[in-house]
Amino acid sequence: SVNIEIPTERNLQLLAPDKNYESIYRPMSYIQQGVLQSAEERTRFRHAPRFAPAGQSTQMIVGATDESDRDILLLSSALYGRPTMKRVYYSGFIPVNPYDKRLPALDKAPLVRENRLYQADWLMRFYGFRAEEIADEQTPRLDLDIDPKLAWALRNPAFFPVDVNRADYEALLRVPGIGGKSARLIVSSRRYRTLTQQSLRQIGVVMKKAQYFISCRELTAGQGVNELRPEQVRRLLTAPQRRRQDRNEGQLTLF
């Protein structure tokens, strides 16, 4: 793997003046060319050796510089456009040198932000989301309190409700609480029966989230994201999380 480390060349040169993006992309291109050439040779010669059979990966440091999550995801999306790029990893910045004024004064690594970026990355790779949808110009930073799929749904209430008995697979993937496996089971199961709340739970749909974004026979009218409004749905879904955090913060430590 060849690590990009810093998401923009400007900040890369600020922290490492001897480096630039050309010195990073050159070996990336070399690896890509080798992988593609090896694949072509294997179509002609069965036992031709493989070149980097696992493909490429890279890593970016999150929180060391001022890039937004949108900047990071747009770069990741471009990297995934390369035919041999398999994974982009995100590593929260861990402060170890408090005397370097070029680095932010953080008490700890931004682990929640790192986790949200991995969730957004998953949406791009497996759920058909584009980077510009997950972090748009109005909201360039991911919401740390809710996952990026739910955040997108709350920003786009006009997309909902999704009829689980009629919607295509791609639309189902955009519903909070419905994953890839659940979406596939919905598509296959509804050929033989009309899906209800109970059958959706059995399939594995997280109804606590999905109920505000879907329509099916048993759901009460007026309880969707458009009737309740996104702000209220957000409060309903984050209230249990806040209560858990409050309980944890109220616990005494041993030392």
Language-model regions, residue ranges each:
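Conserved AdoMet/S-adenosylmethionine-binding subsite of the radical SAM
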Residues: 1-134
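C-terminal extensions
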Residues: 141-171, 197-255
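Residues in the helix-turn-helix
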Residues: 182
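Short alpha-helical segments in extracytoplasmic peptidoglycan/chitin-binding modules
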Residues: 172, 185-186
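A glycine-rich, aromatic-flanked flexible loop/lid motif
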Residues: 82-98, 136-161
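Residue-level signature of tetratricopeptide-repeat
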Residues: 189-190
